[in-house]
């Protein structure tokens, strides 16, 4: 069954060489929040927000978008695809997951990502270091979501007997996702028993990624469940035409 989700980039106004009016930026956030509320009425399953830094996007901290949108919606699943783990301290990641799950009434989805080279490089972080940090934080995240008290000793972080609050509202924890761009990363996701998201690649590569994921999940006896492929699209500018397109997307048999 196809369940339509939205993937939001929240592009910046104007161009990098021209600073936009602050009131226009404030109005942009308000307009997007109103649109996302309307997406719930159109029947979308949920929204994933992207995380990007240093230009092109107004979404450097998408958890704040979830906190703002959660009280204004009732049914939409909300998450980040994905939280760029190499930027963060793992304890803070876990604590914010707990808070957001309560602020959304148990509608949070947990998505993680390694990040993109261009943005990581601005902080003098190589992809090799980013992968190491990501793997270490992912291991801690999985442990912290399932244990009341957690300790960790790794290359980048070490601490003992942390009690991270609040615990998530969803039991055992919210659905977990991982962004993947290769068959091997898809297999790693299956071994963690998490869902995957990929996209913006050739159809044959995407097929290989999902085939590898399902094969690994089957071998482990893990029910793969929901997974997503992200793609771009355009809607007619006339409201009624756009609504008809959205309603057809909502129901594949329409």
What are these regions (language model features)?
Residues 37-41, 66-75, 97-108, 190-191, ...:
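Acidic (Asp/Glu)-rich catalytic clusters
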Residues 43, 51, 69, 100, ...:
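Conserved, mostly hydrophobic/aromatic
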Residues 2, 6-10, 128-164, 204-254:
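An alpha-helical appendage that flanks or caps ligand/catalytic pockets
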Residues 1-73, 77-78, 174:
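N-terminal beta1-alpha1-beta2 module of alpha/beta enzyme domains
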Residues 181-186, 190-202:
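A conserved active-site cap/scaffold subdomain adjacent to cofactor or substrate pockets
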Residues 13-29, 83-91, 168-180, 235-238:
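Active-site mouth loops of central-metabolism enzymes
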Residues 4-8, 47-49, 78-81, 108-112, ...:
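Hydrophobic faces of well-ordered beta-strands that scaffold small-molecule active sites
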Residues 2-27, 86-152, 195-198, 202-204, ...:
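Flexible, glycine-rich active-site loops centered on histidine and acidic residues
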């Amino acid at each position: 069954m196809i369940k339509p989700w939205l993937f939001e980039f929240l592009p910046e106004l104007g161009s990098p060489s021209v600073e936009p009016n602050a009131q226009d930026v404030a109005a942009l956030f308000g307009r997007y929040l109103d649109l996302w509320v309307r997406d719930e009425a159109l029947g979308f399953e949920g929204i994933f927000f992207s995380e990007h830094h240093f230009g092109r996007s107004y979404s450097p901290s998408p958890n704040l978008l979830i906190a703002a949108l959660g009280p204004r919606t009732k049914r939409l699943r909300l998450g980040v695809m994905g939280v760029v783990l190499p930027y963060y301290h793992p304890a803070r990641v876990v604590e914010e997951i707990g808070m957001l799950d309560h602020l959304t009434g148990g509608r949070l989805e947990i998505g993680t990502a390694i990040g993109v080279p261009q943005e990581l490089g601005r902080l003098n972080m190589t992809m090799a270091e980013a992968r190491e940090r990501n793997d270490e934080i992912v291991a801690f995240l999985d442990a912290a979501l399932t244990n009341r008290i957690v300790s960790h000793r790794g290359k980048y972080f070490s601490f003992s007997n942390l009690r991270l609050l609040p615990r998530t509202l969803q039991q055992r924890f919210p659905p977990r996702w991982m962004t993947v761009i290769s068959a091997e990363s898809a297999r790693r996701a299956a071994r963690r028993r998490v869902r995957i998201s990929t996209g913006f690649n050739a159809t044959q590569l995407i097929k290989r990624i999902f085939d590898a994921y399902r094969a690994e999940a089957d071998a482990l006896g893990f029910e793969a469940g929901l997974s997503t492929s992200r793609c771009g699209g355009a809607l007619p500018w006339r409201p009624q035409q756009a609504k008809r397109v959205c309603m057809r997307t909502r129901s594949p048999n329409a």
